[in-house]
């Protein structure tokens, strides 16, 4: 079990490329933290600095109150699972899981107990005598997890462990890792570029862009209260719709749209002095409905109708704006069809057009 404190962490390479900038985060014992962001945002580099595989250029890393910047990786009581399984092909599952413990010269009885315990948790008991070549991708990833589990480390680090698996197996392994966290009751830090993994697994999500933390919060918080346009566009699939416009009285207006703003949201805009400058309205696909209400109804033309099974994703053109609408599958929708859509303005978000920061 472990608490981590990352204080003003920096990573600058010799060519002066600033990969991680002033990273600050407090991680409580037993949390499941997910670092998420696009490729090159610094999430894996941050994880590797925690592991001791990358030198920290500035700031302090504390684990249980002890400064770890200069402590070698092997002495940090950390276990790590990588994107590639890195299993020894000539060894059995048992020997792969036991290898690290043998190198530490741990007693054979203890090794046997730990390996069998981990195999039981991961559903690998019947595969212990097999070699990796006889296993599926998901089973190999479980062996890699098992190799980390048997170390009984204070912190588990996972660097995109599911990205080599197919879509169905990723969903299955997502659930297995979440169950594993509950069983082990330990601190886990997980890196992914997949916002769905972040939303479904994390206690808290750390969203990064260009080496800078954009927002830290529970999945529900970052989804419903995004700090800026990047977060609101990155978290959620399909992404949030954005429309640039201005405020005129109690209306959000563009050249072709006029939508009534609820009093509560209008009061915030007035407080933040956003009435006379360009702003961006954001609204999620599920908050635009293909049925008319008393107000805030707009005519839209469907350009693409994607049926995903339980629902449609409607890609529409609305007054020159491209908007995605999430609709139930009870009705049929077709490309080229004209429909009336309703904006639920109680669910909309407003952002400063210049800074892209949420107006609250």
From Swiss-Prot:
GO molecular function: ABC-type transporter activity; ATP binding; ATP hydrolysis activity
ABC transporter domain ranges (all copies): 4-235
InterPro entries associated with the record: AAA+_ATPase, ABC_transporter-like_ATP-bd, ABC_transporter-like_CS, ABC_transpr_MalK-like, ABC_transpr_MalK/UgpC-like, Mo/tungstate-bd_C_term_dom, NA-bd_OB-fold, OB_MalK-like
Entry GO terms, CC: ATP-binding cassette (ABC) transporter complex, substrate-binding subunit-containing; membrane
Record keywords, A-Z: ATP-binding, Nucleotide-binding, Transport
CDD domains noted in UniProt: ABC_MalK_N
Binding site for ATP: 37-44
Single GO BP term: carbohydrate transport
Organismal lineage: Bacteria, Pseudomonadati, Pseudomonadota, Gammaproteobacteria, Enterobacterales
Family stated for the protein in its record: Belongs to the ABC transporter superfamily.
Coiled coil residues, start to end: none
Organism expressing this protein natively: Escherichia coli (strain K12)
The protein's name in its UniProt record: Putative uncharacterized ABC transporter ATP-binding protein YcjV
């Amino acid at each position: 079990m472990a608490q981590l404190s990352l204080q003003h962490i920096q990573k600058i390479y010799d060519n002066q490329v600033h990969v991680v900038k002033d990273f600050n985060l407090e991680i409580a014992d037993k949390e499941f933290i997910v670092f998420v962001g696009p490729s090159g945002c610094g999430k894996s580099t941050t994880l590797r600095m925690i592991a001791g595989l990358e030198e920290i250029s500035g700031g302090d890393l504390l684990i249980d109150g002890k400064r770890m910047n200069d402590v070698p990786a092997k002495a940090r009581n950390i276990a790590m699972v990588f994107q590639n399984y890195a299993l020894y092909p000539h060894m059995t599952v048992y020997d792969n899981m036991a290898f690290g413990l043998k190198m530490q010269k741990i007693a054979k009885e203890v090794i046997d107990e730990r390996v069998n315990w981990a195999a039981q948790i991961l559903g690998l008991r019947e595969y212990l005598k097999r070699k990796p070549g006889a296993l599926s991708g998901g089973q190999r990833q479980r062996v890699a997890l098992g190799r980390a589990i048997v170390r009984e480390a204070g912190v588990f680090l996972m660097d995109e462990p599911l990205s080599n698996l197919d879509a169905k197996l990723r969903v299955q392994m997502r659930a297995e890792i979440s169950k594993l966290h509950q069983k082990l009751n330990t601190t886990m830090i997980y890196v992914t570029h997949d916002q769905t993994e972040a939303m479904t697994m994390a206690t808290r999500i750390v969203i990064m862009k260009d080496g800078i933390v954009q927002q830290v919060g529970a999945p529900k918080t970052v989804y419903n209260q995004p700090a800026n346009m990047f977060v609101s566009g990155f978290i959620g699939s399909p992404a949030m719709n954005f429309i640039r416009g201005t405020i005129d009285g109690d209306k959000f207006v563009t050249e072709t749209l006029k939508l009534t703003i609820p009093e509560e949201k209008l009061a915030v805009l007035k407080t933040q002095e956003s009435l006379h400058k360009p702003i961006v309205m954001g609204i999620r696909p599920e908050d635009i409905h293909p049925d008319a209400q008393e107000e805030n109804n707009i005519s839209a033309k469907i350009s693409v109708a994607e049926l995903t099974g339980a629902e449609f994703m409607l890609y529409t053109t609305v007054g020159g704006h491209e908007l995605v609408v999430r609709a139930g599958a009870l009705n049929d929708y077709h490309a080229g069809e004209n429909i009336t859509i309703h904006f639920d303005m109680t669910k909309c978000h407003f952002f400063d057009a210049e800074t892209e920061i949420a107006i609250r």
